[in-house]
C-alpha cells in the first residue's frame, strides 16, 4: 500500500491539508515505512520520485552497486569505502547523510576532509546535483533565512524536521562540537591525530529522539563513513581500514568494508573505457599511481 493511499489522496482529489487526526490514525503504518526506509534507502529515494505508484517510472535510476552502497552505509555503524575516481562515492555518501537527516529527526551530522574549503565545495556540489535529480530532497531543506547556508568554506543544510549536516574543519577549531555521525571524505589526506582527538569525539552524545529519549544502540549514533581512494600502508587511514576489517569478521553486524576498481564505472557507463586506455598509453604513465587511483 502506498503512502498516498494511507492518506486517501489520488490524482483526482485536491489536497486541502493533513490534519493531526489523520496522521495519528496512520502512525503505525508510518513507523513501518520509516523503519523499512532506514534499511532500504534506495527504495526511499525511489518512493520520493514515484510516491509508491508502480506505474510511474523514476527519472533517476540507481545502478545495482549504488543500491548496495546506500544500504550498507545506512545499516552499519562503521563503514570504510575504498573506490576509484568516477565511482560516485561522494555523491552517494552525501545522499546517505540526506536520507539519515530526513528519516532521523533532530540529528546532527558532519562531513570533514583534508581542507575545510575542499569539503564545502564537495558537499555543495553534491547536494545541488542530488536536488536537481530528485527535487523532493530540495523540498525537505529549510531555506528560510538563517537556516541552510552555503559559503566558500562552510555549508550547513538544515531540514524541516530539525536535522542538519555541515562541514567541519579537521583542526583544533572543531574541538567541542557535537554531532551524532558523519563522513570522512578522502580520509587518506586527513591528519590521524586530529581525527582521533578532535573529530571522532564530537560523536559522544547520542541523538535526542522526538519523545525526549536517547537510544545508544541506534545505528546513526557514532556512525562513521570513511570514503577514499587507495592510500599507503603505515598510515592512519590504512590502520583504520584494518580495524574495520577485523570488526567485520569479529562483529559482522557492526562494520563493513567495501572496495572496487575502474571496471564497474566503465561497465555502467559512468566512465569511458577509452579514457582509461588513454591513461595507460600516456608516456608519463605511472603504474603505482594508476593502481592507487583506479584499482582501489
Model-assigned labels for residue ranges:
Residues 2-295:
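Phosphate/NTP-binding elements of NTP-utilizing enzymes
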